[in-house]
Curated annotation (Swiss-Prot):
GO CC field: cytosol; small ribosomal subunit
HAMAP family given in the database record: Ribosomal_uS13
Gene designation: rpsM
Biological process, per Gene Ontology: translation
PANTHER family referenced in this protein's UniProt entry, alphabetically: 30S RIBOSOMAL PROTEIN S13/40S RIBOSOMAL PROTEIN S18 (PTHR10871), SMALL RIBOSOMAL SUBUNIT PROTEIN US13M (PTHR10871:SF1)
SUPFAM superfamilies, A to Z: S13-like H2TH domain
Quaternary assembly: Part of the 30S ribosomal subunit. Forms a loose heterodimer with protein S19. Forms two bridges to the 50S subunit in the 70S ribosome.
Protein's name in the database: Small ribosomal subunit protein uS13
Amino acid sequence: MARIAGIDIPSDKRVVIALTYIYGLGNKLSHKILNELNIDQNIRVKNLTEQQLSALRSEITKYNVEGDLRREVTLNIKRLMEIGAYRGLRHRKGLPVRGQKTRNNAHTVKGKPKAIAGKKK
């Protein structure tokens, strides 16, 4: 297994697919990186030379990935909560942030339904 950006990349997969295992690198960005480095997209990770791996590592350091990206996202959410923005309030309450309706669905964000004590017979 090759180690890039602190992540063990599976060696039996194609390079394009294996790069998407890194948080912050999607399909489009992995294609772009491989085109810039002139690396064949269909080659397996185990068949990469050490020179190609080092070029990949140096190219990926240019992008905001893994821990830095996760930290940036959490700080952005924390900032929204501190300034009292509407999105921050939704994050704080654990509700959908992007304008979805909550009357029916949104159970993945809200959690399991809580039982309400009914009227006694």
